[in-house]
C-alpha cells in the first residue's frame, strides 16, 4: 500500500502543469491536465485465483474553464496455476474499459478501448518452485479534438518468474537448557516488464528486469515448556487456556513468494494447487509448517477423542477430488522485500523533435522485528560477532549460540547473568521440594480432637520461565535492476545493484507483574536509521536514499484484582480456588504493536467455602498506540526529493475471560507410623534469592528403625469452562507530505473473537516415601516416586469475523520466550472456525537420595506429554543428571487441519505435518574459582559476634565444551585478578531457644527447638548484599532435625530495571563438580495450620520471630 501510494504521489508531481499560457494545441493541453481521481474499489487476491472489480471512476478536468467528466468502468480476472513437471501455466487477463469525455466549451471527445491477449507458457523443468506468470495487455486511447485526432497505444507485458527457492533443513543446537534452531532460506525472483507506447506515430519501448536474491538466516529459541512443582496430589492444568492476542495476517507483497519445501514428490498425473494458508496462533508452543501431499481421490480422516467421564471428541473427514492440494507457509519470515518502480511518460505530438521524460522510484521496504540500539552491522566475511547483555536475574547461567553460515562466519552470542551472592550450602533437591512445596501435615486419626483439627493443603504451582532468550535474525539481500529503454532505435541501458544486510535482535522486555487496577508501560524505541547507497550507472550520477523511522509505543493494561477464597477448618471438605497470574509483553513491530497476555491457572484444594462461587471474571484492556515517522530522501546531482510519512496506529484489545470451575469431592487417606512434618514460610522482597537445604540427623534414642509413609489421592472429575472474548480495534492514520502537498487517509479494523474452552481433567496420584536409619552408622536412605496421569479433554471453538486484516507479527511471549512466531500471510473477507482437542497428558517423576561417608548424588526425571490437537505439539522430554554428564532430547510432531470457507465461494484447506528431531548434543561445563582473603578480626558486643573480612584477589575460569554431531565447540571465559576491591563483610549471630510439651489423648510428647540467626552483610564500592541465614534445630520425642534457610537480598546492577524472586537449588557432587539446576520463579505461599505441626496451642512464635528478626535486620 505504501509503495503504490508513493507511486501515486510521484505521478501527481510529474503531471503538475506548467505555467505556460493555453495555446491552440488542445491535445497537449489535455495531456498535461491534472486529473483528480475519486474511486472506490473492492479486490481479493490469492494464489489460487484473483478477481479485481473497479467501480465507477470520475475524472474532473478543467477544460477551458468548463467541467469535464470521465467515466471508467472495468473488470479484471486473473487465473494462476502452479507449474509442475507436466503442467503449463496459463495466465489470462481480461480488461474492459470505456471512457467518455464531454467538454462544455468545445467539441472534445475521448474514448478508450481495451483488448486482451491471452498467453501461455510451458516448461519441462521438474523443479516445483519454478513459476511462470506472463500477461500482455494492450490499451488503445483515442482522443478527438476539433483540429486533430490522436491515437495512443500502450502494450504492457508482465513476466514474473521465480527461478530457485532453496530451503535448507533446520539445524538445532542444545546448550544446557536452551535449544537454538537455525533456518536458512534462499530465493531468487526475476521480474521482467515490457512497456511499448505509441503516441502520435512515435514508438517507445521500456524494458525492466529486476533480479532479487534474498538469503535469510533465522536463529530462534523454541519452546521451553514451563516449570512445574509436583506436590503429590494436584490438578495439573497446563497454561494452554491463556488469552492470546489476535494475530491479523497481512497481504502478501508482489515480490514475496511463500516457501515451497520439496519434501515429497507429486504424481505427474495430478494437478498441484498452491494454497495460501491463514495462520492463527492458538497455543503457547511454536509451530513449524511444512508441505504434505494428499493423493488424488483419497479420504484423509482426522479424529481425536479423550478418556474420562467428561469426554469431548471430534471427528473431521476431508475428501479431495482429482486434484492434489499443496499448501505451504513460511513460518520463519521476519522481513519481506517489496520492489516497485514507476514510469511516467509525457510525449507531445507537435512537429518538434520527440522528447521523452523518465522518472524512477525504487523502494525497498523491510518489515522485521525491532532493531536494537546496540546492534552492530558486521560484514559477512568477519570471523565472529559478539554481543553481550546483562539480565535481571541473580543466578549464574551460561548460554551460547553457534551459527554456521555458508560464508564460514561465526556468530556467537554469550549471555552472562551475574550473581551478586555466593552460596556454598549443599542442597538436597528432594528434601527442599518436600519442605517447601509439600505442606502435607496430618497425624493419626486417633489423635484428632475438636481443639486441633487437621488441615490438608495440596497446591500446584505452574510458573513459566522467563529465559530472556533472544531471536537473532540476519537478512542478506542482493537486488539487481537492469533497465533497457529504446526510443526510435536509440537504446539506453541502466544497471543498478544493491547489497543490504540487516542484523536484528528481538530484545526481551520486562513484563509488568502487579495486581493493581491499571498498569501503564511506556516503551520508546531508539531511532533506527538505515542508510542504503544505490550505485546507479546513469550518466555518472549517484542516487543516495536515507530512511529514518521512529517508533514510540504506549501500552495500558487494565485487569481486575484476584478473587481469593476464605478458608474454614470447621469441616473436612474440599473446594477449588482459581488464581490468575497475568504477564504481558509488548512486541514492537514496524507498523502495529501486538500485546501478548499469558495467564496461568492454578488449582488449590483446601477446606474452604468461598465468596466467589467458583466464578472469576478477568478483563484485559490494552491500548497500543504506535507512531512511525519515515523520512525518505533521494539526492541526485543537484536535486533533492524528500517525503515525510507519519503513520499512527491505535489498537484497542479487550479480552474478557470468565472461567467457571465446578468443584467435586475428593478422598484423602494417610497411613503412617511416627512421622513429623514441618512447613516453613519465607517472606522476601522481589529482589531476593531463596536457598533452602534440609539436613536430617538421627540420635541413638530412636525407637523405630523403619518409617514408611504412603499417601494415595484420587481426584474425580473436575470441569472447567472458560469463555474468552477478544475485541480488537485498529485505527491507522497515514499522513504523507511531499513538497507542497499533503495526503491523509484513515483505516479502521475491528476484529471480534470468542473462544469457549471446556477442560475435564482426571488425576490419580500416588506418593510413597520410606526412611531407614541405623543407630550405629550415620547413614540414611530416602526415596520418593510420583506417578501421575491426567486425562484432559480440551475442546476449543474459534469463530472469527473480520473485514480487513493487514499486519506482520513477530510474536515473542515474555513468559517462556519459547514461542517466537514470525509469519506473513494474507487473508480475505469471510469467516473462519477452528476446533482444538487434547487427548491426554502423562507426567511421571522420580528422585532418590543416598547418603553415607562419601557424598554421592544422582537424580533422574522423566516427563512425557502426549497431546493430539490442531496446533499443539506433542512433547516428550527426558533429563538424566549424574556426576558430570547430561543428555537431553526433544521431539515435536504437529498436525494441523484447517478449513476456511468464505462467502464468495473461495475456500482454502491445508493439512500440515511437521516433525523436528534436533541433533544429539552433549555439553560439559567446568568452573574453577579461587579467592584469597586477609586475616579476619573479631569483636564481641552485647552477645553478637561481628566479623570483618577484607578481600584482596578473586579469580574465576569457566570453560564450556559443546559437542554437536561430533563437532566440539569450546567457549572459555577467564575473569582477571581484582586488586584490592575493598569489600567488607559483617556477620552477626543470634540464638533463640524454645521448649515445651505436646499433649495428646494417650501420651505426652516433649518438643524443643533452637534457632540460630546469622546476618551477613557484604558491602562494596557500589552495592551491599545482605544475607540472613536461619538454622533451626528442633527435637520431637528425641528425634532431632536441623533445617537451614537462607535469604539473600542484593540491589540490582545499574543496567537492570527490576529484579525478581527466584528459588535457587544447587547440588554439590563429590564436593568438586557442580550440577546446574534451572532457576525457576516460584512464588512462595504458606498455607496451613501450625497446630498440625505438633505445637501446643498453635505456638508458631518461632516462625514469626524468625521472620520479624529478618525483617528488622533488612
UniProtKB/Swiss-Prot annotation:
Induction record: Induced in biofilms and by alpha factor. Repressed by HAP43.
Compositionally biased region (Pro residues): 240-252
Propeptide: 1090-1114
Recorded topology in the membrane: Lipid-anchor; GPI-anchor
A GO term from the CC aspect: side of membrane
Signal peptide: 1-21
Major subcellular site: membrane
Protein name: Filamentous growth regulator 23
Organism annotation: Candida albicans (strain SC5314 / ATCC MYA-2876) (Yeast)
Gene transcribed to yield this protein: FGR23
Amino acid at each position: 500500500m505504501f509503495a503504490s501510494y508513493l507511486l501515486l504521489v510521484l505521478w501527481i508531481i510529474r503531471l503538475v502543469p506548467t505555467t505556460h499560457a493555453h495555446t491552440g494545441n488542445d491535445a497537449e493541453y489535455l495531456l498535461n491536465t491534472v486529473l483528480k481521481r475519486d474511486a472506490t474499489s473492492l479486490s481479493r487476491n490469492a494464489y489460487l485465483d484473483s478477481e479485481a472489480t473497479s467501480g465507477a471512476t470520475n475524472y474532473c478536468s478543467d477544460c477551458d474553464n468548463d467541467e469535464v467528466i470521465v467515466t471508467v468502468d472495468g473488470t479484471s480476472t486473473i487465473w494462476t496455476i502452479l507449474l509442475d513437471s507436466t503442467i503449463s501455466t496459463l495466465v489470462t487477463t481480461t480488461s474492459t474499459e470505456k471512457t467518455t469525455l464531454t467538454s462544455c466549451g468545445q467539441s472534445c471527445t475521448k474514448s478508450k478501448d481495451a483488448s486482451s491477449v491471452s498467453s501461455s507458457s510451458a516448461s519441462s523443468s521438474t523443479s516445483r518452485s519454478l513459476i511462470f506468470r506472463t500477461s500482455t495487455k494492450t490499451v488503445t486511447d483515442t482522443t478527438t479534438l476539433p483540429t486533430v485526432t490522436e491515437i495512443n497505444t500502450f502494450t504492457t507485458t508482465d513476466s514474473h518468474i521465480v527461478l530457485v527457492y532453496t530451503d535448507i533443513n533446520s539445524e538445532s543446537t542444545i546448550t544446557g537448557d536452551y535449544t537454538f534452531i537455525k533456518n536458512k532460506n534462499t530465493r531468487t525472483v526475476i521480474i521482467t516488464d515490457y512497456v511499448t507506447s505509441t503516441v502520435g506515430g512515435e514508438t517507445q519501448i521500456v524494458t525492466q528486469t529486476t533480479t532479487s536474491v534474498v538469503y535469510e538466516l533465522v536463529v530462534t529459541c523454541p519452546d521451553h515448556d514451563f516449570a512445574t512443582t509436583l506436590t503429590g496430589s494436584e490438578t495439573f492444568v497446563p497454561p494452554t487456556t491463556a488469552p492470546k492476542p489476535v494475530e491479523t495476517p497481512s497481504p502478501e507483497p508482489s515480490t514475496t513468494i511463500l516457501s515451497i519445501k520439496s519434501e515429497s514428490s507429486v504424481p505427474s498425473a495430478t494437478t498441484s494447487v498452491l494454497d495460501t494458508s491463514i495462520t492463527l496462533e492458538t497455543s503457547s508452543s511454536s509451530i513449524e509448517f511444512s508441505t504434505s501431499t494428499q493423493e488424488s481421490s483419497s479420504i484423509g480422516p482426522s479424529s481425536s477423542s479423550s478418556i474420562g467421564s467428561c469426554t469431548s471428541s471430534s471427528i473431521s473427514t476431508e475428501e479431495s477430488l482429482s486434484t492434489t492440494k499443496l499448501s505451504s507457509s513460511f513460518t520463519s519470515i521476519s522481513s519481506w522485500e517489496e520492489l516497485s518502480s514507476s514510469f511516467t511518460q509525457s510525449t507531445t505530438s507537435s512537429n518538434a523533435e520527440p522528447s521523452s521524460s523518465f522518472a524512477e522510484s525504487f523502494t525497498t521496504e523491510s518489515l522485521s522485528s525491532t532493531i536494537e540500539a546496540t546492534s552492530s552491522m558486521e560484514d559477512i566475511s568477519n570471523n565472529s560477532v559478539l554481543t553481550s547483555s546483562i539480565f535481571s536475574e541473580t543466578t549464574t547461567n551460561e548460554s551460547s549460540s553457534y551459527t554456521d553460515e555458508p560464508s564460514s562466519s561465526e556468530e556467537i552470542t554469550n549471555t552472562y547473568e551475574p550473581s551478586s551472592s555466593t552460596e556454598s550450602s549443599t542442597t538436597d533437591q528432594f528434601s527442599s521440594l518436600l519442605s517447601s512445596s509439600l505442606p502435607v501435615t496430618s497425624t493419626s486419626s486417633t489423635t484428632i480432637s475438636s481443639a486441633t483439627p487437621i488441615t490438608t493443603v495440596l497446591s500446584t504451582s505452574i510458573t513459566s520461565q522467563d529465559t530472556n532468550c533472544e531471536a537473532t535474525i540476519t537478512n542478506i539481500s542482493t537486488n539487481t535492476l537492469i533497465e533497457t529503454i529504446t526510443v526510435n532505435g536509440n537504446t539506453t541501458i541502466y544497471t543498478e545493484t544493491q547489497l543490504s544486510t540487516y542484523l536484528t535482535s528481538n530484545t526481551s522486555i520486562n513484563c509488568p507483574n502487579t495486581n493493581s487496577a491499571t498498569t501503564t508501560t511506556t516503551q520508546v524505541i531508539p531511532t533506527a536509521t538505515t542508510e542504503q547507497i544505490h550505485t546507479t550507472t546513469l550518466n555518472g550520477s549517484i542516487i543516495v536514499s536515507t530512511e529514518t523511522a521512529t517508533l514510540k509505543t504506549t501500552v495500558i493494561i487494565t485487569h481486575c484484582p484476584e478473587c481469593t477464597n476464605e478458608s474454614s477448618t470447621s469441616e473436612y471438605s474440599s473446594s477449588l480456588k482459581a488464581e490468575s497470574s497475568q504477564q504481558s509483553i509488548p512486541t514492537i513491530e514496524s507498523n502495529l504493536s501486538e500485546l501478548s497476555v499469558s495467564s496461568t491457572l492454578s488449582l488449590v484444594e483446601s477446606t474452604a467455602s468461598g465468596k466467589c462461587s467458583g466464578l472469576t471474571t478477568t478483563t484485559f484492556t490494552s491500548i497500543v498506540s504506535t507512531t512511525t515517522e519515515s523520512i525518505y530522501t533521494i539526492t541526485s546531482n543537484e536535486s533533492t526529493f524528500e517525503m515525510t510519512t507519519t503513520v499512527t496506529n491505535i489498537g484497542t484489545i479487550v479480552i474478557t475471560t470468565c472461567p467457571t470451575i465446578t468443584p467435586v469431592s475428593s478422598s484423602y487417606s494417610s497411613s503412617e507410623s511416627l512421622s513429623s512434618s514441618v512447613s516453613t514460610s519465607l517472606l522476601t522482597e522481589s529482589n531476593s534469592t531463596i536457598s533452602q537445604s534440609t539436613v536430617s540427623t538421627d540420635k541413638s534414642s530412636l525407637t523405630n528403625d523403619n518409617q514408611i509413609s504412603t499417601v494415595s489421592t484420587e481426584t474425580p472429575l473436575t470441569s472447567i469452562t472458560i469463555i474468552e472474548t477478544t475485541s480488537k480495534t485498529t485505527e491507522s492514520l497515514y499522513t504523507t507530505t511531499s513538497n507542497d502537498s499533503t495526503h491523509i487517509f484513515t483505516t479502521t479494523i475491528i476484529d471480534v473473537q470468542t473462544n469457549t474452552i471446556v477442560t475435564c481433567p482426571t488425576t490419580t496420584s500416588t506418593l510413597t516415601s520410606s526412611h531407614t536409619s541405623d543407630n550405629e552408622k550415620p547413614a540414611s536412605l530416602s526415596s520418593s516416586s510420583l506417578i501421575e496421569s491426567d486425562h484432559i479433554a480440551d475442546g476449543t471453538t474459534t469463530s472469527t469475523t473480520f473485514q480487513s486484516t493487514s499486519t506482520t507479527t513477530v510474536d515473542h511471549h515474555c513468559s517462556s520466550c519459547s514461542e517466537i512466531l514470525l509469519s506473513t500471510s494474507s487473508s480475505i473477507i469471510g469467516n473462519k472456525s477452528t476446533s482444538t482437542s487434547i487427548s491426554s497428558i502423562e507426567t511421571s517423576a522420580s528422585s532418590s537420595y543416598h547418603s553415607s561417608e562419601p557424598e554421592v548424588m544422582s537424580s533422574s526425571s522423566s516427563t512425557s506429554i502426549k497431546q493430539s490437537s490442531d496446533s499443539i505439539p506433542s512433547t516428550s522430554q527426558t533429563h538424566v543428571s549424574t556426576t558430570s554428564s547430561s543428555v537431553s532430547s526433544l521431539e515435536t510432531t504437529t498436525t494441523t487441519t484447517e478449513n476456511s470457507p468464505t462467502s464468495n465461494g473461495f475456500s482454502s484447506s491445508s493439512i500440515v505435518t511437521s516433525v523436528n528431531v534436533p541433533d544429539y548434543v552433549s555439553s560439559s561445563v567446568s568452573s574453577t574459582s579461587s579467592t584469597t582473603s586477609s586475616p579476619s578480626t573479631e569483636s564481641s558486643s552485647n552477645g553478637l559476634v561481628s566479623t570483618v573480612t577484607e578481600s584482596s584477589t578473586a579469580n574465576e575460569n569457566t570453560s564450556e565444551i559443546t559437542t554437536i554431531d561430533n563437532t566440539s565447540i569450546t567457549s572459555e571465559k577467564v575473569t582477571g585478578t581484582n586488586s584490592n576491591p575493598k569489600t567488607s563483610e559483617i556477620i552477626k549471630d543470634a540464638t533463640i531457644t524454645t521448649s515445651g510439651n505436646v499433649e495428646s489423648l494417650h501420651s505426652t510428647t516433649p518438643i524443643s527447638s533452637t534457632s540460630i540467626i546469622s546476618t551477613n552483610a557484604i558491602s562494596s564500592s557500589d552495592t551491599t548484599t545482605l544475607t540472613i541465614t536461619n538454622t533451626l534445630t528442633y527435637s520431637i520425642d528425641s528425634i532431632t532435625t536441623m533445617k537451614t534457610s537462607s535469604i539473600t537480598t542484593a540491589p540490582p546492577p545499574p543496567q537492570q530495571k527490576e529484579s525478581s524472586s527466584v528459588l535457587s537449588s544447587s547440588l554439590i557432587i563429590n564436593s568438586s563438580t557442580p550440577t546446574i539446576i534451572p532457576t525457576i520463579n516460584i512464588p512462595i505461599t504458606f498455607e496451613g495450620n501450625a497446630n498440625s505441626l505438633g505445637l501446643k496451642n498453635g505456638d508458631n512464635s518461632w516462625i514469626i520471630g524468625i521472620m520479624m528478626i529478618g525483617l528488622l535486620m533488612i
